[in-house]
Structures are given as structure tokens and as C-alpha cells.
Amino acid sequence: MGVVQLCYNTQNLVGTGCYERDGGLSGFGREVVAEMNRVGIMCDLSHVGPTTSEEVILESKKPVCYSHCLPSGLKQHPRNKSDAELKFIADHGGFVGVTMFAPFLAKGIDSTIDDYAEAIEYTLNIVGEDAIGIGTDFTQGHGQDFFEMLTHDKGYARRLTRFGTIINPLGIRTVGEFPNLTETLLKRGHPERVVRKIMGENWVNVLKDVWGE
């Protein structure tokens, strides 16, 4: 196991998720972060609230990540991250994976690969070319029961949200269409050097830093 989500949307013993009033990182949570640093597991804050996230970023001795998120500057949603949150994690050596999960994109299920590229560019302008990568959050092959679980606290309790139809942006709906993203970023004027970083080189570098490989 190389990456662990510290909270999933709501409160647990470590801290607070992004759908609740955030009480911050607990004392036990600090022990968890220290142990994850020791054994080489990356702290993932994608579903974590802003206060807990900030305290994990400051507590961790290794880079942490939002492995799959989008900027709230393009769409307000509890799962999306503010410009300040994105800048804070990057300024402290962390990493941002930009997701293509349609409900969090500005145009929802009407999004295209260019809308996803816009989200990448928005994030890139905040975090810089070395702290950004792809965070697909692909969920192909799962039935409605899976999404019902995701939208309830702890998978079964109170409902937190409704996703509606789940479909990836047109042009990058499967892993097989990933070359389309490379082509799109190049066509939008990004240098090949930067596109290589976004498409995977940056992830390799940050994971080596955490895992020690």
C-alpha cells in the first residue's frame, strides 16, 4: 500500500472530511501521519477538509497530495479545492492530481477533453509545472450500488450528495484515449517538456520521494 486517504468526506478518528465542519487533525491523526512517513505511505487529502489538510501538510515530513481534485475557482463543490488550498500544498512540497470526474467539472457530464485541459491549466497556473499530474478517479465498470455507497456517510448512513449520471469527459472516457490528452495539451500550446511532467513524470518523482524507491 503506497497511498492512503486520511478521511473520506466525513469525520473519523484522524480528522475531518470535506463535507463537514472541520475540527482539524486529531492527536491520533498526528501519530498516523508520523507512522505513514516512517513506512513510506503517502498521505492523500483529496476527500479531507481544509483545516485537517493544512495541519497534515504542516505535520508531514514527506510530500502529501490531493491525488484527485479540481479547483473550486472553476466550480464550487465541497470536493474541489480553493486557490489558497492548492497554493498551500504546492508551497509546502506537496502534489496535486487533477481529476476528470465529471460532477466536479464546471460543465458536468457535458464536459469535453478541452474542459478537462482547462482545469489542468487553471491548476498549473497556481501550483507550477512540478507539482501537478493526472488524477483520473476513473470508476468504469461499477454499478449504481457503488455510487450509492460513495454518496452516503461511511457507505451506508446519511446521504451526503447525489452525483446523478457519471460519464467521463468526451474525448477521454477510457484509458485508451489518454493519447488524446497529450495531443490536446500540445495543441493548446504547452511545451512537450511540461506535458511529459503532467502526464506522469511528476508523479514518478514525488512517489519516489515518499516511497524511497
Model-derived segments and spans:
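Active-site micro-motifs of SAM-dependent methyltransferase domains
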Residues: 71, 140, 205
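A structural motif corresponding to the C-terminal end of an alpha-helix
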Residues: 35-41, 126-129, 181-194
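Short, surface-exposed alpha-helical recognition segments that flank or form part
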Residues: 44, 111, 169, 173
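Mid-to-C-terminal alpha-helical segments outside catalytic/metal-binding sites
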Residues: 164-213
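Extended, charged catalytic domains and RNA/DNA-binding interfaces, predominantly
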Residues: 1-110, 117-125, 131, 152-159, ...
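Short acidic/histidine-rich active-site segments
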Residues: 127-152, 160-165, 170-171
